[in-house]
């Protein structure tokens, strides 16, 4: 098993030696079963001829020129197995124990590198991501600038079109106002002339009515005077007739009254004589009875 593993490890893969690994006395008999169980797992021995498709899915290979980055990708990992094995054998380990430690160390390092590769971001990935982010940001900025320029140009064209429309509308409004002003002036003049003609006609009619009224008043006044004189003449005739009647009736009435008075006087005298005779007869009768 160890010989096969050793043959599988080529010298070309071990160009870079792992520094800073302290070798302690390890019970190899405890580590050998663990190393044998790890041999069943997938090994990540990276070499110059390793294809990227053989690596685990989800891992991105970034070939960078930086030698002192903290985490290298699995494809750039090189383990100097010969120097490591020679160092262990110089420390007193046998060849099998050294090969077991080599295998276990290789497994631990590979697992740690895979864990770091899955959980941490390498400097190259970070640089690529930052570069992609800066590129996307610059593209977004340029697109935003272009969009803003397009918007500004569209706004300017819309503003110019609006200005032209406003100017045309202003010109149309001025034309309509001038037309309305002219029409209103003409209408006002026509109305003024019509009103003047109507006033003249009304004045002529008023004068005509005044003349007719004056003539009618003259006729009415003459008729009134005529009727007044007729009434005066009628009243004078009535007064004269009444006066003549009085002149004729008063003497006749006075004569009738004088005659009535004379008759009354005679009747009075006759009555007083009869009363005296009755009084004398009464006194005679009374005396006879007594």
From Swiss-Prot:
Gene Ontology cellular-component annotations: mitochondrial inner membrane; mitochondrion
InterPro entries, per database record: CCDC90-like
Coiled-coil stretches noted in the UniProt entry, renumbered to this chain: 161-216
Membrane-crossing segments per the record: 236-256
Membrane topology: Single-pass membrane protein
Any single Pfam family the record assigns to this protein: CCDC90-like
Main location, first listed in the record: mitochondrion
UniProt keywords, alphabetically: Coiled coil, Membrane, Mitochondrion, Transmembrane, Transmembrane helix
The keyword Membrane appears for this protein: yes
Example GO BP: regulation of proline metabolic process
Name under which the protein is recorded: Uncharacterized protein C27B12.07
Compartments (UniProt record): Mitochondrion membrane
